[in-house]
């Protein structure tokens, strides 16, 4: 179904009407203490980026790594950019490299302290809603905005088709991502940060 947000769809099954479109996570004092140690290495103002889309389910949510790099090159002149993710994923230039230094939960606590998370639709975007941090989310034609976008986020829909819902590579999703002008994202981030 693509007519409602996924949270609304799940709540509908349990007869819960008008749920808040946000997730909930709860953290221990130890988790918060470790997060403080990690974030103490950073400037007061920073943004978090996860440029890699988990592709073992579908490759069709990905946004070009080169475009993420262009964004970091421009944004990094005015604000610190911290990259999270798996230790074996490619690292962007000009970022604070926290790949492999955080779990999903500790990355969420780092995002809590950030001004913004930049990513494609995925787990960290959902987690950011639990800690009240706005995300800039790139959404491809793989899925509909209505199903995955949170109203508190900056949602950039780049699809010209769909939702395809394909788990195999979609040529339309790939083409849309390749031709998207990253400047649209840059302008939205600058507007948000100023």
Give the residues covered by each predicted segment.
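Catalytic machinery of carbohydrate-active enzymes
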Residues: 1-194
């Amino acid at each position: 179904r693509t007519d409602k947000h996924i949270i609304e769809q799940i709540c509908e099954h349990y007869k819960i009407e008008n749920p808040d479109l946000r997730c909930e996570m709860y953290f221990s004092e130890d988790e918060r203490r470790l997060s403080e140690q990690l974030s103490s290495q950073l400037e007061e103002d920073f943004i978090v980026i996860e440029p890699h889309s988990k592709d073992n389910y579908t490759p069709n949510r990905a946004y070009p790594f080169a475009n993420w790099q262009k964004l970091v090159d421009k944004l990094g002149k005015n604000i610190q950019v911290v990259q999270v993710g798996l230790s074996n994923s490619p690292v962007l230039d000009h970022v604070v490299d926290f790949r492999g230094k955080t779990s999903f939960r500790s990355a969420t606590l780092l995002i809590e302290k950030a001004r913004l998370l930049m990513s494609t639709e995925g787990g960290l975007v959902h987690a950011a809603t639990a800690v009240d941090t706005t995300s800039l989310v790139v959404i491809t034609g793989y899925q509909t905005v209505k199903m995955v976008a949170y109203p508190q986020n900056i949602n950039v829909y780049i699809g010209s088709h769909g939702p395809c819902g394909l788990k195999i590579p979609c040529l339309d999703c790939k083409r849309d991502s390749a031709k998207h002008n990253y400047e649209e994202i840059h302008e939205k981030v600058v507007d948000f940060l100023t």
